[in-house]
Each structure stands twice: as structure tokens, then as C-alpha cells.
């Protein structure tokens, strides 16, 4: 539709003194009823729209003046003139094109298509004019889209559409979530309110996109975290064991540093044990020596008896054997004293070197004691043999005599 011709026709209608219908402007209303798009602003065709609305209501009443039957008790009865003035007042109060402009143009171009009674027609018109949202003409847009609006509902089409809505007589209606935004070629206000809110919607869409991206990344991170849950727990357990071990080592070191007296006491106790072990070893040696002496005495008794028997034979040989036995006894006693002294020195050194091995030392001493006893027995036996040999030796010359 030619916008320039439409604007000229609207200007001519305003200049006329007597308001009459125009075929060109009626075609414009039919175009809006079919497509739902207005190519001019609301203030430009507002006057002709109000004129056409009033004329259609009057013509509808003239064709059906009286209501048939009794009025509906569930519906409030409003006189025609009062309803007419109410509708005209609402329409003249609009500062922008109402989003129901397509349905209103359908009622103006073909009023008897859906209504037969005047009161029902007026109620239908009232329902479509009692709106607060508005649309902008497509001529004010920088580009067109594939969206169209019919009776406030958006649907795809190949024609230009009015996608923006602003507040006319109250708060705006809810907006779709993903709706393309277009900037106006010239700043415009509706009902005294600036249009800055409409221009800021692109920023809001960008924020919503960033928020959705962040939510998606969080979901991905949450999906990957359960996979690494067990490995994280294992590492945490190993770290706890290492910390406990380090704490135990540090506690032992602190206890050793804090109790130096206890360590010194332990050393003194060990020294005392070593001394007591050495004293017990000395006592054991003395007892061994006394036992050895008793064994020697017991062994000497048979030797003396043999000497007494030999003394009966010859007194001279007995004296010789006694002297030899005494000499042998002295030599044996000197040898035993030397061995005892050497054993005592060795035992003292071993007791001072290791106090903890007292038991082993005592066993060694017992072994040595038994060895000494055996040695003394052998020694005592050897003199007896010598004495017998000595007794046999003097007998030979006596036989010769």
C-alpha cells in the first residue's frame, strides 16, 4: 500500500469541515483487517478511526433499534448512548495503536459478520478496546521480520509486523522470551513514558545468554566431579596417614628432648646392674674356689691311705713320698691360684663390658668352674700315680739287697 497517498488522504480528511467516509481510507482499514499491519502512526489515522467507529455503531442501531425479548438477568443492561460514549472515550484516550487493531478493523469493515444485536455488538467492541498494550507501525522500523500479530497473538507470516509493545494506559503485557529486538529510527514516547526500557532489552537478552552458558558449564562440571570422587578420597586418606605418622615422630622427639633426666636415670640403672652382676660373679668365684679346695681334700684322702700302707713297708720310702707329694701339692696350688686370677680378671672385664649378658656370663663361669674341678682332679690323680711310681722305685733296690 502506498504510504504517501495514504498520508495525503488522511490530511484531506482532517481539513474537511464535513466528515465523510473515504473509499481510500476504507481500503486502508480493510488492509489492516487482513494483514494486521499499520503503515502509519496512530495519531495520523486516529481521527478517521474514531469517525468510522461512531458511524458503524449508529448504523447498527438503525438497522436493529429494539431488543427482542426480556433482557438477560445475568448481564447488566446499559443504554446504547452510555455504552457508545464509554467506547469512544476509551479509544480517544489511546496514545498508541492498540494491539487489537486488526480485530477492531474487522468489526468496522464487516460488523454483521458475527453479531446481529446492537447490545452484543457494543459489548464485542468494548472488549477489544479495553486493552493497555500497543504496537508500532512497520514504517518506523529499520527492517521487517517474519512475525505478524492478529488480535494480540503473534504468528509467522511474510509481511511486516509490529513486534514492539509499550505501555498505553497501564502496565505492559508479558513479553515472549526469545523475541527479536529492533531499534527505532527516531526516539518516541508512549503515554508520557520514555522508550528507554524497550532499547535496553537487547542487553537483557545478552545477560540471559551468559547466565544460560554459565549454568551449562556448571552442569558439566557437576557431571565430571563424581568420576574423580573416589580418587580424591584415596588421596585424602593417604595424606591423613602421613600427617599422623609425622605427628607421632615429632611427639617422640619432643618427649626425648623434654625428658633428658629419664635417659640419665636409665644409664645409671644400667651401671648399677653391671656392678651388681660383677659382685655376684665374685661371690660365685669364691664359692667355686671353696668347692675346689674341698674336692682337693677329698681326693687327698686315698693318697694318704696308700702312703700309710707303703709306710708300713718302709719308713724311708714313706718320707720320700710325702716330700714329693707335698712338693707336687704346692706346685698344683700355685698353678690353680694363677688360673683363678686369670679367670677373675677375664670375668671382671666381661661383666663391665655388657651388664645385660649377666646370665650368659654366669653360665660361662659355671662351665669354667667345672673345667677347673676337672683339672684339679687330673692334677690330683697325677701325683698319686707319681707316688705309686716312687714307691715302686725304692722297692727294686731292696729286692736286690
UniProtKB/Swiss-Prot annotation:
A single Gene Ontology CC term: protein phosphatase 4 complex
Membrane spanning stretches: none
InterPro entries in alphabetical order: PPP4R2
Disordered: annotated segments: 139-401
Cystine bridges: none
GO molecular function: protein phosphatase regulator activity
Pfam families attached to this UniProt entry: PPP4R2
Subunit structure: Serine/threonine-protein phosphatase 4 (PP4) occurs in different assemblies of the catalytic and one or more regulatory subunits.
PANTHER family, A to Z: PPP4R2-RELATED PROTEIN, PROTEIN PHOSPHATASE 4 REGULATORY SUBUNIT 2-RELATED
Name assigned to this protein: Serine/threonine-protein phosphatase 4 regulatory subunit 2
The organism of origin for this protein: Xenopus tropicalis
Amino acid at each position: 500500500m502506498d504510504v504517501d497517498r495514504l498520508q495525503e488522504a488522511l490530511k484531506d480528511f482532517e481539513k474537511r469541515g464535513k466528515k465523510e467516509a473515504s473509499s481510500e481510507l476504507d481500503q486502508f482499514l480493510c488492509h489492516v483487517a487482513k494483514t494486521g499491519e499499520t503503515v502509519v502512526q496512530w495519531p495520523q489515522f486516529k481521527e478517521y478511526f474514531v469517525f468510522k467507529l461512531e458511524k458503524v455503531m449508529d448504523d447498527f442501531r438503525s438497522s436493529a433499534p429494539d431488543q427482542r425479548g426480556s433482557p438477560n438477568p445475568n448481564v447488566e443492561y446499559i443504554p446504547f448512548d452510555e455504552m457508545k460514549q464509554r467506547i469512544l472515550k476509551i479509544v480517544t484516550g489511546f496514545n498508541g495503536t492498540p494491539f487489537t487493531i486488526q480485530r477492531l478493523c474487522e468489526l468496522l469493515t464487516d460488523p454483521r459478520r458475527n453479531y446481529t444485536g446492537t447490545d452484543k455488538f457494543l459489548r464485542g467492541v468494548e472488549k477489544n478496546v479495553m486493552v493497555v498494550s500497543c504496537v508500532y507501525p512497520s514504517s518506523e522500523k529499520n527492517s521487517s521480520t517474519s512475525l505478524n500479530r492478529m488480535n494480540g497473538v503473534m504468528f509467522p507470516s511474510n509481511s511486516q509486523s509490529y513486534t514492539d509493545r509499550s505501555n498505553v494506559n497501564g502496565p505492559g503485557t508479558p513479553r515472549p522470551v526469545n523475541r527479536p529486538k529492533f531499534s527505532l529510527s527516531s526516539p518516541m514516547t508512549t503515554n508520557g513514558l520514555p522508550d528507554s526500557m524497550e532499547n535496553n532489552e537487547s542487553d537483557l537478552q545478552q545477560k540471559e545468554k551468559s547466565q544460560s552458558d554459565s549454568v551449562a558449564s556448571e552442569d558439566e562440571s557437576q557431571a565430571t566431579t563424581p568420576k574423580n570422587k573416589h580418587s580424591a578420597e584415596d588421596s585424602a586418606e593417604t595424606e591423613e596417614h602421613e600427617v599422623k605418622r609425622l605427628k607421632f615422630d615429632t611427639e617422640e622427639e619432643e618427649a626425648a628432648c623434654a625428658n633428658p633426666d629419664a635417659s640419665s636415670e636409665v644409664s645409671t640403672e644400667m651401671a648399677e646392674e653391671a656392678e651388681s652382676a660383677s659382685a655376684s660373679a665374685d661371690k660365685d668365684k669364691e664359692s667355686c674356689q671353696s668347692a675346689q679346695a674341698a674336692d682337693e681334700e677329698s681326693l687327698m684322702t686315698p693318697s694318704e691311705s696308700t702312703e700309710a700302707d707303703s709306710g708300713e713297708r718302709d719308713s724311708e720310702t714313706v718320707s720320700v713320698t710325702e716330700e714329693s707329694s707335698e712338693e707336687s701339692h704346692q706346685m698344683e696350688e700355685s698353678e690353680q691360684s694363677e688360673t683363678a686370677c686369670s679367670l677373675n680378671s677375664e670375668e671382671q672385664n666381661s661383666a663391665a663390658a655388657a651388664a645385660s649378658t649377666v646370665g650368659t656370663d654366669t653360665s660361662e663361669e659355671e662351665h669354667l668352674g667345672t673345667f677347673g674341678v676337672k683339672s684339679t682332679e687330673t692334677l690330683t690323680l697325677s701325683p698319686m700315680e707319681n707316688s705309686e711310681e716312687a714307691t715302686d722305685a725304692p722297692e727294686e733296690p731292696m729286692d736286690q739287697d
